[in-house]
Regions:
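Core segments of cupin and vicinal oxygen chelate
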Residues: 1, 11-56, 60-64, 103-106, ...
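Serine-centered coil/turn micro-motif
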Residues: 76-78, 122, 146
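Short, flexible, solvent-exposed loop/turn segments with mixed acidic/basic and small polar residues
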Residues: 1, 58, 81-87
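N-terminal beta-strand motif that seeds the catalytic metal site of vicinal oxygen chelate
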Residues: 1-20, 89-96, 146-152
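Short, solvent-exposed interaction modules
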Residues: 82-110
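A short, acidic/glycine-rich surface segment
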Residues: 33, 76-81
Length: 152
């Protein structure tokens, strides 16, 4: 498996509103997307952009790795359990892009890695799946099909 672009770092939070204030006021984030619900996954999500590569003029292009803020919706046991262990929230997962989600899934399975569920539509509108942290150096890892042009 060839390592793809780091698309985002997922951060579980008990309050997206409080996390937005933190990234804006403490970390200086200037582009924070509107939060939205993903009922199929039981979460509310908000993306915070980080600067992309320098253009050489001191300015940054868009397209840096994003922070994905994740707040559980009622009934979401997995994120709620994470927050019970980590009441202030914290890093939940990392997400890498691949060109073909089904080929990536087959490769990971052939290596004996535990895929957590079938590919499904994620927050960027592309197919995703997760890999068990015990098989990934202790890190819950999301694999996502690279977004179409213009999407992040």
């Amino acid at each position: 498996m060839k390592l793809g672009r780091l698309n985002h770092i997922g951060v579980a939070t008990p309050s997206i509103a409080d996390s937005i204030a933190f990234y804006r006021d403490v970390m200086g984030a200037t582009k924070i997307h509107a939060p939205f619900d993903l009922p199929d996954q039981g979460v509310k999500v908000c993306f915070v952009d980080t600067p992309g590569p320098s253009t050489g003029s001191g300015q940054s292009e868009s397209g840096g790795t994003q922070i994905e803020l994740i707040e559980p919706l009622p009934g979401n046991a997995s994120i709620a359990a994470f927050l019970q262990k980590n009441p202030a929230g914290g890093q939940h997962h990392v997400c890498y892009e691949v060109p073909d989600i089904h080929a990536a899934k087959a490769e990971f399975e052939a290596m004996g890695k535990r895929v957590l569920g079938e590919p499904r539509i994620g927050a960027h509108g592309t197919l995703i799946f997760f890999l068990h942290p015990k098989d990934m150096g202790g890190v819950l890892t999301e694999i996502m099909e690279s977004p179409k042009e213009g999407a992040h």
